[in-house]
């Protein structure tokens, strides 16, 4: 299936050819705030909705209730950052089962920028806050079995996360 994210709705394209393609609604009341937050994470799709981080499975199965939001434990951080962030970036680190989301505000210095690390555990999700990363883009690369977590900044530099404390590793 192909999911189609809109600002206020989510649809699913099903079928295998032009003769049986069909677009069906997943929800007509919740959408995705920013496409850069959509990531495959732990066998599901995670995205930033207006009420925090959501999974497609939770949104589909539960409907449009708050139960579909996985970030309830840290909702105050999302509430403080969703409204006035100028951009969002996210990255998944599969071998650590982590989803990281970064909130960028044009008026804030890089060292005050906040983000959230979401870790998938057997019994749910755990969260921690990260500060000081203001990425313009993010990615992971597997090189000789090693996972490199990278982000580009707004000055044009590429930084490596997970090594050292300056991101220059």
Residue ranges of model-derived segments:
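Beta-sheet-dominated scaffold domains
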Residues: 1-169
């Amino acid at each position: 299936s192909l999911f189609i994210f809109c600002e206020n709705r989510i649809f699913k394209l099903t079928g295998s050819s032009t003769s049986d393609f069909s677009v069906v609604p997943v929800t007509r009341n919740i959408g995705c705030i920013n496409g850069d937050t959509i990531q495959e994470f732990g066998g599901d799709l995670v995205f930033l909705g207006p009420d925090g981080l959501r999974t497609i499975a939770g949104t589909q199965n539960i409907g449009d209730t708050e139960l579909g939001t996985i970030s309830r434990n840290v909702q105050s951080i999302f509430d403080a950052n969703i409204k006035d962030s100028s951009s969002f970036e996210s990255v998944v680190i599969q071998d650590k089962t982590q989803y990281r989301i970064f909130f960028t505000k044009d008026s804030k210095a890089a060292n005050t920028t906040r983000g959230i690390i979401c870790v998938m555990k057997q019994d749910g999700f755990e969260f921690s806050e990260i500060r000081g990363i203001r990425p313009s883009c993010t990615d992971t690369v597997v090189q000789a079995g090693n996972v490199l977590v990278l982000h580009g900044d707004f000055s044009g530099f590429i930084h490596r996360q997970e090594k050292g404390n300056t991101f220059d590793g």
